Structures are given as structure tokens and as C-alpha cells.
């Protein structure tokens, strides 16, 4: 069970994810430089971490989506293996065409760093099988471009295909655009591809993986991945 | 060009003539003009800075390096420093603030440390003016824009409004980094026969003469100064951090230096002088952003995101490869030689040939005359008009907690990534910010404090109280202090009354540091913060750093539990002069703040640290701005529960609840711990003042304040 964490120029959560996977969750993880063309032997999970790849110049994630390593990541995804994009990594996945939609500037037009309540919409994915459906969890967000957008018809398809995994929510469990701090359509915070093996989300599970940092709701994501890779549940 | 136009005084020019034995050429004159400016030479402040105690058991590297380093335990060091970027932020708020953050991060990097957190000190003018709105928005976005991208969390700071900052807003940027004690970089280790390598951005015409610009008063037309402000690129800075740390990890560099004020000249001559080597630089080899730059422009450009590396010949190839890996320009621009000569060449011609030690170390000190301000007695005469205030405390509390300097600052802190690097245990919004060190399990506690109102009434007492007030939050959280860094923001030293205030404030700081054994490990001075005769109040800003050992957990505020007993520790006779209450309600500062009380501070320290270590309290907060009333209000809001307070007062209730100063704190103690808590505080003034519970804050002889109303006032909702 090995994870590879891709490091783009400007990634700044790569070390955080390596810490959460390796030290906290016990999933051996290694950094992979974006100029590499193949993933390390035995990679089962690829994580595209948060940060400001290429300084967010041009468009968030646009240049990183054209990095040499992305070919190998795409190949990995097409084989049905796991890819997780967090924050800037989610933006890269949409730019690479591995996930639908686009992340636009927050409706506040400001950077927002804040803890957020999320409602878990699906528990039958490799990333969320340790959660209870409808559970409220707290992950922080920290981004300027996190407004999830899709044209209406595609958005409807996304919902019909049950591709929404996390939605911004309030304490009473309601979720939607009104609960989303950044104006995301339908309150969407994280989605999977049709096959369910590629997850992108704006909130940071790696920042919610230790009690000393204020919460451990993110731990269940790592545990979900672990048990899925160990063949425990699908 | 004559020496005056270069910004030199005649006495200084005479020294240059004497030392060189000839007249300097134009390039040399410009170099001296910048390097001997106030900003680079500290010529006005050096005599005062000598007052600071710099030694301490846990100081690994002190003043004289880019940043001080203290021992964080188990072979790890913490490098930290605070620096101003006031003038640039007044002219171009976004870039001025952004490059302030970038500059201090490189100072920390230059010590070989990975930058792990920032704090920002923000001082703005009239909160309702269009100018303040523009400046504060730009500065906050600049701090966030740079810090967020570069991946260094902004975990706290200080924000204060006063009309005297209207034309001269202050931005003080603090950064702290982690370094293995054995890998600290010193600028004294260059050897002859090494390559001088420039890594990072190309050099352009931005920021030329920035240091000199920061050494005079701001002009009224700030737009005219725009060319002196640098433009930042946090993306390149992030690459630079990773590249430099990778080079250090692989032992590829002998030493390195960040490029800030006075660019290549400053960084290169500093290494040469401190290491006792000479240097020849070929300016033709500097990667340029624009063509036909002349020698002095290249030598003095303050283009951002550049580092100077000194590399042994056998490591050069690996360093160049590293530059390529990180897509950074990386060029050999010269070599180190035996001797003391600092030579700049371009196109085969020598443009400067100076003794390296003269450039950075030759500027004579200036001892400005100091004069006690004529109106000081008048400032210090205090007549507290108690008759103007009813005994009700609720209304003044609701007004004060909604005042610009005390109200919630979420509009600022939400724009900062305070959590990246996953170390933030206590982020913005508390008197102390806390980080964990993954490498050794210890916790670092950091505070930032500045008390311009108290300092303008009595700069000595103000300086002392500023220092003590920066330490108290550390102690209350359970941390033992390791050291402090300071940024001395003052107006022109050429005005004798202003210089007197500067001197007194520094003496106050220094005496407190000595009394409490807190070494000063780094710092920065920013003078000439005035525009057209309008001066900022004396604003010495202090950041203190302490450590909580791995086995202990921090005692934090915002955690009142139902049934907790509230204790006020410390004297009740604090002071209204210089307080938020006086500034906000009386509009006029007057009177004398409290005199220092070293024994009280030491006694407080010992007991506070013990209280945290024994986990005797659920929640604790030192009394800071707004005194007891604001501490109660904030604790109540943050904990989401009310309290009933009963307290007899010998004087007017307002004086008890809103006075400031002195070693005081508010503790919430569960019933089972009350006996041990009181034993711990034996020998120190302590008084039980209330009980936690209910959904309102009930102050004596006052209407209860429902929590929701209190929180809305604070949040400005």
C-alpha cells in the first residue's frame, strides 16, 4: 500500500499530506517531482496536494495539469486506481479533465481560511467508506478560487450520477449554496468521477487529522482509503 | 553627483575621503549613500540598541546575524525576527506589505531555517476615512496574498487604529523558522576562492534606492515614490525556499545571504566583511530583467526573491543543477578573494573598489540631542472625570468591545491561511499564538505587543509595560520565554523631543528584558515615520517567543465551563492613562501609566507557568487592552457561556473594570482545583470574582448582557 504525493512548483501542502498519510494514518507515502514521467513502482494512491502550483498564474491548476507527471496520473486513474486532489489538486484535476466542472473565484472575491462543516453525501466510495452517510464533519478550507461551477444541465447530470461526495452544510444538517462559504453551486465541496476512483475536494482533510490541531474528522478519509486498498470494503 | 545628493552628511563624507585616500566615484558614492542610510546603517539607533541584553543560556545565535536563533530543545533552533515595511506600505499598500512579508521570510531562510509562521502588526489611521480603508484593505490583501501563496501560515498579530497613523500606516512583519541547531547558517563562514552565486529572480530597476527612501520622511505626494517600492512574486519565493533548503541539506553552500535593502551590494559586502574575505563581482553576469542597466542600478536594485550563495568550486555544478530543477535563474556573478577589497566590474571596467568592511561597518553613529518634551508634564497630568460615568458597566463594555481596535478582526484573519504546514495549535484571535514542532514535540508560543498610547504618555514606562505585556501571554499559556525581537517604529530622530521619547522607550524595553532575563536576539528600527510634521506616536513593537515542553499542554483562553470559578490574579489598581477606555471615551490621552514592578512580574511568571503545567484552570487570559471588562467579554463570547461577577471596588467601578497594565490575568478554575489553584498563587494578589454559567454576562450593579448581544457587538453584526 503506497501513496505518491505529487509536488508541483508552488505546491505547499505536499509536506502536510505526507505527514498525515505517513505519520498519522500509517500509509507509506513518497513525494514525486512533477517533472517525473512515471509514478513510483507500487503506487496505489496518487495525491495532488494543495498550494499555488505555478503561482496560480494563468488559471489555478492550468499549468500543473500539463506537467509531465500528469500523463502517468491519468493512466493511473484510467486503470481505476485512486487519485485524490485537495484544494489546488482539485483544481488541477478539473483542468486535466479528470473531473468535471471548474473552480471559480469565491463569491466574496476574497481568500477564505475557515473551518467548515461538510455533509458526507456518499459512503460507498474508496475515500469515504468509514463515514456515516449524512454525517457532518469539519474540515478547514483555505482558498480564493473554490466556487464549484458547472452549466445547469451538466450539474444535473452530476447530481443524478451521485457524484457529489461532500457538501457545505450548517449545523442543522442542511446543505446547499446558502451554506457554502464560497458560493459553490448546490453547496458542492467535493466530487468523484463517474467511476468513483478520482476524488477532488476543496476542504483540507490533512488539516483535520490530529486532535492537537483541533479535529480528527479527516482521519476517516485516510482510514477509508486504507481499508479500501486492503480490500476491506468497496 | 555630490555627497549631499547621495544622502550623506559632511562628516560622513570626510570619513569616506579619509578611509579611501581619494574621492569616491559616482557608483561608490551611491553605494555609500544607500549603505550609510539610516535604514541600512542604524546610525541613529546603534547607541541605544547597545542597551539591550543579548545574552542568554538558550541563545544559539544573537544580534548581528540575519535573525536570532534560540534553542527549542532536542537539537532544534528557532530563528525569528520582526521587521518593518512601513514606508512602502504607505505608498503602495498591496506590494509594500507583500514584499515586507517576503523580505522577513528570506531573513529567516538565510539562517538555514524553514519558515514556519508569520505574524503581522498593523497600525492604521482613522477607521472611517477613505484613505485608511484603501490602505488597510491593500495591506491585508498584500500580507495574505504573499503568505498564502508561499505557504507560511499567518498565525496572529496585532491591529490598532489611531488617527496619528493616517498618513503613516505601519506594517511590521514577523517570521519564525525551524532549523537543526547544527545546520544554522552564519554569514561569517565564506572562504577565499569560492564562487558567488545569485539564485532567484532576475534583477530589474524596481526598488532602487528603497533603503534611502525609507530613511527620510514620507513626501505628501506618495505616488511620486512608487518606483522605490518593490514588486513581489511569492511563487518564486516558494521555489527559492525549497531550492535553498535543498542546497543546505546537501551541504552545497558555505553560506548565504538574502537580498533585501541595497540588494547585491549589501548582501555581498556583508558576507565579505563578516567573513573577512574580499570579493570581485562581475555585474555583466547578473541576469537582468531589462537591458542597459548601469552598474550602480544593478548593484543597488532591490528586486525581490533573490539569494546570494557562496559555493565551493566542487559544489558549483550541483548548485547550478538545483537552480535548473526549480526553474530559477542561477548565475555565478563573482568570486571571493583574500583580503578586504570589494570590487564591482562591468564591461571590463572597475566601477567600485572599496574596503568591504567600510561599506557596511564604517558609518559613524549619530548621537542626536534628546530633550524631554515641553508638554510632557501636561500630558501626564490626569484628572479622571468619574462624574461623567454612571456606575453601569454594561454599556461602556458593549461600546468598547465594538471599538475599532478591540472588535473582532475576522475580516483580516479569514484572508490569511493560518493552518498550512499543519502546526497551528492556536491561531489568530488569542493573545498568544501556538505552534507545535513536529520534530521534537515541543510547542512554541508567540506574542506580539505594542502600546503606543501608553508610550506617548510615558515612553519609559510604556516601553517596560510593552515588554512585560508581551511576556505575560506566554507565561499564562504555560510557556517559558526564550527571547524577544523588536521593531522600533518612531518618527524622525532629528527632533530632540522625539529622540528623547525613542531613547526612553528603548530604556524601558531594555530594563524589562534585563529584569526578566529575556534576551533580545534580533530587531529592526524604522525611523522617520512622519509626513509634513505629522508624526506617529512612539510605537515599539515586541514579539516574544517561548516554549512549552512536550509533556505539557497549553492553557488557552475561550474555554470557560459551567460552574468554573473566576479568579482575578494581580493588583486591582491598574491604570486608566493610556488605556483603550481613555482613548475611546475620553478621546484624549493623559496621565501616567503604572511604574514597572519587576518583582510582581517575576512572581506572576512563576505562578502562571505552574498553573498551566498543573492543568489547574480550564481557561485563562492575561488582561490586555480594555482591561478586566474586555477580558471577561471576550472569554464569555469565545466560550459561549455567561458569568455572574461580584466584586467590591474601592474606587469608581470603571477604574477597576477598564484600567490596564500590570501583571494580571483572569482564570476559570473548576471547583475541584480551587484549593490547589489558591495554593499555587499564594503570596500574590488573588481574588475570586465570579462564577461561570447562564447565557448572559452579569457585571456588578449593571444590566445583564445577553451573550448574543455581546457577541454581535464584538463582531459588528
Region spans (language model):
Chain B
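Glycine-rich phosphate/pyrophosphate-binding loop regions near the starts of catalytic domains
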Residues: 30-239, 245-248, 254, 269-273, ...
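Catalytic nucleotidyltransferase
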Residues: 233, 593-599
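Glycine-/charge-enriched secondary-structure boundary and capping motifs
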Residues: 1-6, 10, 16-29, 167-169, ...
Amino acid at each position: 500500500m503506497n501513496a505518491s504525493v505529487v509536488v508541483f512548483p508552488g505546491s505547499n501542502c505536499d509536506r502536510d499530506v505526507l505527514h498525515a498519510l505517513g505519520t498519522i494514518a500509517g500509509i507509506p507515502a513518497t513525494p514525486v517531482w512533477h517533472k517525473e514521467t512515471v509514478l513510483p513502482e507500487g503506487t496505489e494512491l496518487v495525491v495532488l496536494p494543495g498550494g499555488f502550483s505555478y503561482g496560480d498564474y494563468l488559471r489555478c491548476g492550468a499549468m500543473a495539469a500539463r506537467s509531465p507527471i500528469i500523463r502517468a496520473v491519468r493512466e493511473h486513474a484510467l486503470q481505476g486506481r485512486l487519485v485524490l486532489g485537495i484544494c489546488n489538486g482539485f483544481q488541477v484535476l478539473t483542468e486535466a479533465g479528470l473531473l468535471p466542472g471548474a473552480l471559480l473565484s469565491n463569491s466574496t472575491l476574497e481568500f477564505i481560511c475557515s473551518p467548515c462543516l461538510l455533509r458526507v453525501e456518499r459512503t460507498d466510495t474508496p475515500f469515504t467508506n468509514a463515514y456515516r452517510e449524512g454525517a457532518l464533519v469539519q474540515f478547514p478550507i483555505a482558498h480564493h478560487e473554490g466556487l464549484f461551477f458547472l452549466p445547469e444541465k451538466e450539474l444535473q447530470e452530476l447530481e443524478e450520477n451521485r457524484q457529489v461526495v461532500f457538501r457545505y452544510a450548517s449545523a442543522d444538517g442542511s446543505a446547499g449554496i446558502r451554506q457554502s462559504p464560497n458560493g459553490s453551486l448546490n453547496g458542492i465541496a467535493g466530487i468523484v468521477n463517474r467511476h468513483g476512483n478520482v476524488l477532488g475536494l476543496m476542504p483540507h482533510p490533512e488539516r483535520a487529522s490530529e486532535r492537537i490541531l483541533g479535529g480528527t474528522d479527516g482521519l476517516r478519509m485516510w482510514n477509508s482509503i486504507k481499508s479500501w486498498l486492503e480490500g476491506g470494503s468497496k | 553627483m555630490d555627497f549631499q545628493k547621495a544622502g550623506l552628511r559632511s562628516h560622513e563624507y570626510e570619513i569616506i575621503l579619509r578611509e579611501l585616500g581619494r574621492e569616491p566615484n559616482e557608483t561608490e558614492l551611491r553605494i555609500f549613500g544607500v549603505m550609510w542610510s539610516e535604514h541600512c546603517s542604524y546610525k541613529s539607533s546603534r547607541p541605544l540598541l547597545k542597551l539591550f541584553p543579548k545574552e542568554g543560556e538558550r541563545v544559539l545565535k544573537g544580534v548581528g546575524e540575519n535573525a536570532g536563533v534560540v534553542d527549542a530543545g532536542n537539537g532544534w533552533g528557532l530563528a525569528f525576527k520582526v521587521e518593518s515595511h512601513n514606508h512602502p506600505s504607505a505608498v503602495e499598500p498591496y506590494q509594500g506589505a507583500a514584499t515586507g512579508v517576503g523580505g522577513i521570510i528570506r531573513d529567516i531562510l538565510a539562517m538555514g531555517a524553514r519558515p514556519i509562521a508569520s505574524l503581522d502588526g498593523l497600525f492604521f489611521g482613522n477607521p472611517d476615512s477613505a484613505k485608511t480603508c484603501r490602505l488597510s484593505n491593500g495591506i491585508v490583501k498584500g500580507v495574505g496574498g504573499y503568505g498564502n501563496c508561499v505557504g507560511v501560515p499567518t498565525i496572529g498579530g496585532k491591529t490598532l487604529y489611531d488617527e496619528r497613523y493616517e498618513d503613516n500606516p505601519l506594517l511590521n512583519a514577523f517570521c519564525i523558522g525551524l532549523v537543526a541547531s547544527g545546520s544554522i547558517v552564519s554569514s561569517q563562514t565564506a572562504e577565499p576562492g569560492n564562487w558567488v552565486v545569485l539564485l532567484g529572480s532576475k534583477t530589474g530597476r524596481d526598488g532602487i534606492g528603497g533603503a534611502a527612501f525609507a530613511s527620510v520622511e514620507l513626501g505628501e505626494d506618495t505616488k511620486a515614490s512608487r518606483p522605490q517600492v518593490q514588486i513581489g512574486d511569492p511563487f518564486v519565493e516558494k521555489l527559492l525556499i525549497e531550492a535553498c533548503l535543498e542546497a543546505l541539506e546537501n551541504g552545497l553552500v558555505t553560506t548565504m545571504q538574502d537580498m533585501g535593502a541595497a540588494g547585491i551590494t549589501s548582501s555581498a559586502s556583508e558576507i565579505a566583511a563578516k567573513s573577512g574575505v574580499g570579493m570581485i563581482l562581475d555585474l555583466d553576469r547578473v541576469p537582468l530583467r531589462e537591458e542597459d542597466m548601469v552598474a550602480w542600478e544593478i548593484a543597488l536594485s532591490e528586486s525581490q526573491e533573490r539569494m546570494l550563495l557562496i559555493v565551493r568550486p566542487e559544489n558549483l555544478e550541483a548548485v547550478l543543477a538545483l537552480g535548473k530543477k526549480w526553474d530559477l535563474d542561477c548565475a555565478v556573478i563573482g568570486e571571493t578573494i583574500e583580503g578586504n577589497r570589494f570590487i564591482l566590474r562591468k564591461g571590463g571596467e572597475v566601477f567600485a573598489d572599496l574596503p568591504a568592511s567600510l561599506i557596511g561597518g564604517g558609518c559613524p553613529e549619530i548621537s542626536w540631542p534628546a530633550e524631554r518634551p515641553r508638554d510632557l508634564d501636561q500630558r501626564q497630568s490626569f484628572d479622571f472625570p468619574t462624574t461623567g460615568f454612571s456606575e453601569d458597566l454594561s454599556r461602556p463594555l458593549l461600546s468598547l468591545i465594538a471599538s475599532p481596535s478591540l472588535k473582532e478582526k475576522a475580516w483580516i484573519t479569514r484572508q490569511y491561511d493560518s493552518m498550512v504546514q499543519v502546526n497551528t495549535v492556536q491561531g489568530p484571535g488569542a493573545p498568544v499564538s501556538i505552534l507545535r514542532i513536529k520534530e521534537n514535540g515541543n510547542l512554541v508560543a508567540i506574542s506580539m505587543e505594542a502600546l503606543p498610547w501608553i508610550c506617548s504618555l510615558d515612553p519609559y514606562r510604556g516601553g517596560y509595560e510593552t515588554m512585560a505585556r508581551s511576556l505575560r501571554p506566554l507565561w499564562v499559556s504555560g510557556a517559558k520565554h526564550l527571547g524577544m525581537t523588536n521593531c522600533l517604529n518612531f518618527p524622525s530622530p532629528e527632533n530632540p523631543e522625539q529622540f528623547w521619547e525613542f531613547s526612553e522607550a528603548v530604556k524601558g524595553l531594555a530594563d524589562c528584558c534585563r529584569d526578566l532575563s529575556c534576551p533580545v536576539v534580533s530587531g529592526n528600527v524604522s525611523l522617520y515615520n512622519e509626513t509634513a510634521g505629522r508624526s506617529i506616536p512612539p510605537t515599539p513593537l515586541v514579539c516574544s517567543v517561548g516554549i512549552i515542553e512536550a509533556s505539557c499542554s497549553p492553557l488557552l483562553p475561550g474555554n470557560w465551563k459551567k460552574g468554573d470559578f473566576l479568579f482575578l490574579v494581580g493588583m486591582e489598581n491598574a491604570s486608566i492613562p493610556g488605556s483603550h477606555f481613555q482613548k475611546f471615551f475620553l478621546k484624549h490621552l493623559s496621565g501616567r501609566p503604572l511604574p514597572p514592578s519587576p518583582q510582581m512580574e517575576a512572581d506572576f511568571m512563576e505562578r502562571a507557568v505552574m498553573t498551566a503545567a498543573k492543568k489547574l484552570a480550564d481557561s485563562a487570559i492575561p488582561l490586555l487592552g480594555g482591561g478586566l471588562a474586555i477580558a471577561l467579554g471576550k472569554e464569555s463570547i469565545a466560550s459561549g457561556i455567561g458569568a455572574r461577577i461580584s466584586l467590591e471596588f474601592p474606587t469608581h467601578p470603571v477604574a477597576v473594570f477598564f484600567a490596564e497594565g500590570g501583571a494580571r490575568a483572569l482564570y476559570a478554575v473548576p471547583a475541584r482545583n480551587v484549593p490547589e489553584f489558591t495554593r499555587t498563587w499564594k503570596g500574590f494578589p488573588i481574588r475570586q470574582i465570579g462564577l461561570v454559567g447562564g447565557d448572559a454576562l452579569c457585571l456588578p450593579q449593571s444590566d445583564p448582557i445577553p451573550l448574543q448581544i455581546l457577541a454581535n457587538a464584538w463582531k459588528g453584526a
